[in-house]
């Protein structure tokens, strides 16, 4: 499945994560490397949340950011979140994808999706942020794994 393929690609990026550069950011407005990688790992767990809830309300504290300090923590959580998402997806009927899922900030509706659209959005977010991580890697001379084919680093290995 696409979720599995995106997990495998994400795993390659997390396997290359440099523990020595947790606080690196290419610009003052950019996320630091560890929070970016943490966010990517969290996104892999979003399908499970989206399938087992009807909404997420930031104001109510439904989202609690994770804080990691090492590649090993990232890898462990990535595997855990993937397993939970795969389990939720395996128990889902096709009709279940038509259910509603929304994001709120208190009374303000931020996003209103079908469960299918919410998962599709999560996969888009995963691709977007993983590409950011690839730029960070390139700027710090860390090998960039290929996502949908070999990267420049892999072509010459």
Where are these regions (language model features)?
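Short, contiguous alpha-helical
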Residues: 4-11, 21-64, 104-157
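An acidic, carboxylate-rich microenvironment
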Residues: 35, 72-73, 96, 117
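Helix-adjacent hinge/juxtasegments
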Residues: 49, 54-93
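Acidic catalytic patch
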Residues: 91-108
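Active-site rim elements
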Residues: 1, 70-75, 120-123
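A structural signal for well-ordered alpha-helices, especially hydrophobic packing surfaces
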Residues: 14, 44, 82-89, 130
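A non-catalytic, amphipathic alpha-helix used as a structural packing/dimerization or gating element
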Residues: 2-5, 9, 76-87, 128
């Amino acid at each position: 499945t696409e979720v599995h393929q995106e997990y495998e690609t994400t795993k390659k990026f997390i396997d290359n994560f440099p523990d020595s550069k947790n606080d690196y950011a290419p610009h003052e407005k950019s996320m630091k490397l560890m929070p970016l990688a943490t966010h990517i790992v969290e996104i892999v767990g979003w399908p499970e949340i989206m399938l087992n809830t009807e909404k997420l309300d930031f104001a109510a504290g439904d989202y609690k950011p994770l804080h990691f300090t090492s590649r090993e923590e990232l890898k462990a959580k990535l595997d855990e979140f993937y397993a939970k998402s795969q389990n939720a997806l395996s128990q889902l009927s096709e009709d279940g994808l038509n259910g509603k899922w929304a994001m709120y900030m208190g009374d303000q509706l931020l996003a209103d999706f079908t469960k299918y659209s919410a998962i599709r959005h999560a996969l888009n977010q995963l691709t977007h942020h993983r590409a950011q991580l690839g730029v960070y890697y390139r700027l710090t001379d860390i090998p960039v794994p290929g996502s949908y084919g070999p990267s420049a680093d892999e072509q010459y290995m």
